[in-house]
Amino acid sequence: MPHSDELDSRDVLSVSGLNIAFHHEGQQVDAVRNVSLRLKRGETLAIVGESGSGKSVTALALMRLIEQSGANVRCGEMLLRRRNRQVIELSEQSDAQMRRVRGADIAMIFQEPMTSLNPVFTVGEQIAESIRLHQRASHEEALAEAKRMLDQVRIPESQAILSRYPHQLSGGMRQRVMIAMALSCRPAVLIADEPTTALDVTIQAQILQLIKVLQQEMSMGVIFITHDMGVVADIADRVLVMYQGEAVETGSVEQIFHAPTHPYTQTLLAAVPQLGAMRGHSLPRRFPLISADEPALYESQIEQDTVVEGEPILQVRGLVTRFPLRSGLFNRVTREVHAVENISFDLWPGETLSLVGESGSGKSTTGRALLRLVESRQGEIIFNGQRIDTLSAGKLQPLRRDIQCIFQDPYASLDPRQTVGYSIMEPLRIHGLGQGDAAAKRVAWLLERVGLRPEHAWRYPHEFSGGQRQRICIARALALNPKVIIADEAVSALDVSVRGQIINLLLDLQREMGIAYLFISHDMAVVERISHRVAVMYLGQIVEMGPRRAVFENPQHPYTRKLMAAVPVADPSRHRPRRVLLSDDIPSNIHKRGEETPAVSLQLVGPGHYVARPLQDNALSRL
């Protein structure tokens, strides 16, 4: 049925009176109430709000995917203008018709790429499949286009990446693959649900620039769902603010940032972490929080040095981790990924050492090597005076109580067949630390400490938002009262208020229990807030390391300065300068087998502040 008269000539999407409800334990739970929005060609509409506010549910409803979760969707209208200019009512389309519409006319980039990519197919096959389906291209043409899209999202060694599987890529690279797949068919509307959450600041800036360039070329409408107000200021034309399932304020990006009218919008903006806010402070400080009852900011700024002098609890010496790449007729190892190259550092009790760097720089691999989830090629890992890199699995088991981890992808970390209460209780049972009522009380306490309710223990992972799932993973990591927690992008999926709550919780636990954190993150504003010391990684090596104040207030290495410059600012009047993205600007840590990476030499430039000699590298020479 044509609906062209009901849609303005410049609009590509119009939604009015959207209501979404779920049935839980015999009761109806309203997730979205009476939300309306319009999107014009070439326009970017940002939908912002806290975790659980209904942002992602709204996006899934537009894709007609939410019904598969048992949702009840009621809507006045949901009109889409396809690439061929035909206007259709999305709610009237059959499943077969929607399969033709998805990808070709309306595409979506999901928040968690590992759950969106098929683990049994290569990256190239998955991108090519979408191109073959919607553009009727041959297999060879589709693979060539897939490589071109990987080049556009700046994945190094794109030809080699085509034949790799999702689990062989870092979280940031998987997200770039998702973006390439969504843009491959040049849809009329692109829905981006936290598309840069897993990306470091430099790649994030480049991806945002890429989306804007492609948007201008194709007159594509973009719905950008995010909790990062700096990204909103950088990319959005208009903003829709959601709170508890309702649209509480909408307007141009200038109106929302410079003259917000709703109290929730005002407090949301005030809670945004700003790079440079820690200038003059040497110790970590708590984030200001949003009170749910009264939208005002409050914080405790009592600075306390939690670092315990004496012997480090964790020592890393000359750590090297490499991964083989096979090719050829006989599937021999011909090249290697030099993920971590000769890095050394110490971690003291009660200290937070942050590892920062681009996706693929070796941050996460370092954390996994310390946990013995991947085996290192050489080097020493010493925990509490005991070398652990040579221990057998049986002897390593008791030590796992003292070293816990929080991974980047919460959905992949939780068993979808078990309640979250069982997942949190499982470590207690494995290590014989609690049974029955005692374990249940511990689970209830942990859920409350991370901002959830005790009754949530009976729910399953799919019933929570991405941010809530990450809080569950943090609760599980805290269950055993560890001495060291390796937090791999632990707060990257959380909105600003929940992120602040979790960081404050980590700081409180550090103060109470003396926990040491190895904090792996690409969020420089969060790193500045939580860290005692910072180590900057580039292509598997540490190029700058020192006290947080020294590194942030006086960065010495050009790569560190590049990371600082790429941080988005929550002010639409202060745009980053754009630069041309060059193909040879893509760093790569893939080398021929037997080829050694030149080791960087760290020089002391201040108290505890070490900087590598400038790298002779094409990418860094232009910084």
Curated annotation (Swiss-Prot):
Enzyme class: translocase
Places the protein is found: Cell inner membrane
Gene Ontology terms, MF aspect: ATP binding; ATP hydrolysis activity
Residues bound to ATP: 49-56, 357-364
Residue intervals of the ABC transporter domain: 15-269, 325-564
Annotated disulfide bonds: none
Keyword line: ATP-binding, Cell inner membrane, Cell membrane, Hydrolase, Membrane, Nucleotide-binding, Repeat, Translocase, Transport
NCBIfam families according to UniProt: PRK10261.1, PRK10419.1, PRK11308.1
Record's function text: Part of the ABC transporter complex GsiABCD involved in glutathione import. Responsible for energy coupling to the transport system.
Protein name: Glutathione import ATP-binding protein GsiA
